[in-house]
Amino acid sequence: MSSSLFAPTIETIDYPFPPKPVPLSDAQKADYKARIKQLLIEKDAVLVAHYYTDPEIQALAEETGGCVSDSLEMARFGRDHPAKTLIVAGVKFMGETAKILSPEKTILMPTLEATCSLDLGCPIDKFSAFCDAHPDHTVVVYANTSAAVKARADWVVTSSIALEIVEHLDSEGKKIIWGPDRHLGSYIAKQTGAEMLMWQGDCIVHDEFKANALRDLKSVYPDAAILVHPESPASVVAMADAVGSTSQLIKAAQTMPNERFIVATDRGIFYKMQQAAPGKTLIEAPTGGNGATCKSCAHCPWMAMNGLKAIEASLSNSDKTTHEIFVDEDLRVKALIPLTRMLDFAKTLNMKVKGNA
């Protein structure tokens, strides 16, 4: 049984949700896609998109020889691809991770305003002070963090390898600081028995899944398997037939015998999940329930900012200040250390690291 301790609660953040991109007509979409395809060739660029972006963006990445995956695989694909420029359709920390692994490349994003509640909820000054107050602890941070927070950490982990790394550190008798996702941290502590001092951040999408409403939905579809990302509350995770990272949930939909799945993660994943399990029915897990309203409604508002118009602008604008990612070199070198530590650990386990981030 774990005896996890919690960090002092940081003040509640009222996240400023961005406006959604203006819907485009089919003709406009076709024009933007054609223009983007041409610009990718002209600029020696490749498009990498996260599982949580809109389906048409994921499809465009696939059509143009790019990549659709989690943030770390996006960064690794970009590092290993010969293109000199990477267009990262995702949120800002993903662009930073790509820059950390590919400092010599130009990293562009459709918008630098696309952020993440986990990143916003873990400001480096407060997190660093918290770590300084517990110098005997090993600092483990989730990949969904800023370059500065990664640079302050001993280990960076994705959701698919977090259990193994925490288990390893616990077996060595290490005390652990975990940040920033409290739900994922609680899940790991419960699974491993490790004592973890936890930062109190959460993902606005996963935090909204409701156990009571999920129970009601399950009664409507009793034959459906419930797939849950561990950034969800413990009450939701407890109902899962499979818990895992984005890649692991896609694999579960593909391999489990059920014909129906209730999916508790960002609905952007349905595009690749349906590809992997073409004959199966995917149902969104409820984020409201009992008259409650949802804020994110199972889709990250910042991921939704990655529209065709913004991607075209990132490639065509001569002024890159609103699109290009820069990471201070000293910070980059420091952040690369815990990232490399994770990748090396994964090699010893002979596993390919995929996570949510």
Swiss-Prot record:
<keyword id="KW-0408">Iron</keyword>
<keyword id="KW-0963">Cytoplasm</keyword>
<keyword id="KW-0411">Iron-sulfur</keyword>
<feature type="binding site">
    <location>
        <position position="300"/>
    </location>
    <ligand>
        <name>[4Fe-4S] cluster</name>
    </ligand>
</feature>
<feature type="binding site">
    <location>
        <begin position="229"/>
        <end position="231"/>
    </location>
    <ligand>
        <name>iminosuccinate</name>
    </ligand>
</feature>
<feature type="binding site">
    <location>
        <position position="50"/>
    </location>
    <ligand>
        <name>iminosuccinate</name>
    </ligand>
</feature>
<feature type="binding site">
    <location>
        <position position="203"/>
    </location>
    <ligand>
        <name>[4Fe-4S] cluster</name>
    </ligand>
</feature>
<dbReference type="GO" id="GO:0034628">
    <property type="term" value="P:'de novo' NAD biosynthetic process from L-aspartate"/>
</dbReference>
<keyword id="KW-0004">4Fe-4S</keyword>
<keyword id="KW-0808">Transferase</keyword>
<dbReference type="InterPro" id="IPR003473">
    <property type="entry name" value="NadA"/>
</dbReference>
<dbReference type="GO" id="GO:0046872">
    <property type="term" value="F:metal ion binding"/>
</dbReference>
<dbReference type="GO" id="GO:0051539">
    <property type="term" value="F:4 iron, 4 sulfur cluster binding"/>
</dbReference>
<dbReference type="Pfam" id="PF02445">
    <property type="entry name" value="NadA"/>
</dbReference>
<keyword id="KW-0479">Metal-binding</keyword>
<comment type="similarity">
    <text>Belongs to the quinolinate synthase family. Type 1 subfamily.</text>
</comment>
<feature type="binding site">
    <location>
        <position position="246"/>
    </location>
    <ligand>
        <name>iminosuccinate</name>
    </ligand>
</feature>
<dbReference type="InterPro" id="IPR036094">
    <property type="entry name" value="NadA_sf"/>
</dbReference>
<feature type="binding site">
    <location>
        <position position="159"/>
    </location>
    <ligand>
        <name>iminosuccinate</name>
    </ligand>
</feature>
<comment type="function">
    <text>Catalyzes the condensation of iminoaspartate with dihydroxyacetone phosphate to form quinolinate.</text>
</comment>
<dbReference type="GO" id="GO:0005829">
    <property type="term" value="C:cytosol"/>
</dbReference>
<keyword id="KW-0662">Pyridine nucleotide biosynthesis</keyword>
<comment type="pathway">
    <text>Cofactor biosynthesis; NAD(+) biosynthesis; quinolinate from iminoaspartate: step 1/1.</text>
</comment>
<dbReference type="GO" id="GO:0008987">
    <property type="term" value="F:quinolinate synthetase A activity"/>
</dbReference>
<feature type="binding site">
    <location>
        <position position="116"/>
    </location>
    <ligand>
        <name>[4Fe-4S] cluster</name>
    </ligand>
</feature>
<feature type="binding site">
    <location>
        <begin position="142"/>
        <end position="144"/>
    </location>
    <ligand>
        <name>iminosuccinate</name>
    </ligand>
</feature>
<dbReference type="InterPro" id="IPR023513">
    <property type="entry name" value="Quinolinate_synth_A_type1"/>
</dbReference>
<protein>
    <recommendedName>
        <fullName>Quinolinate synthase</fullName>
        <ecNumber>2.5.1.72</ecNumber>
    </recommendedName>
</protein>
<feature type="binding site">
    <location>
        <position position="71"/>
    </location>
    <ligand>
        <name>iminosuccinate</name>
    </ligand>
</feature>
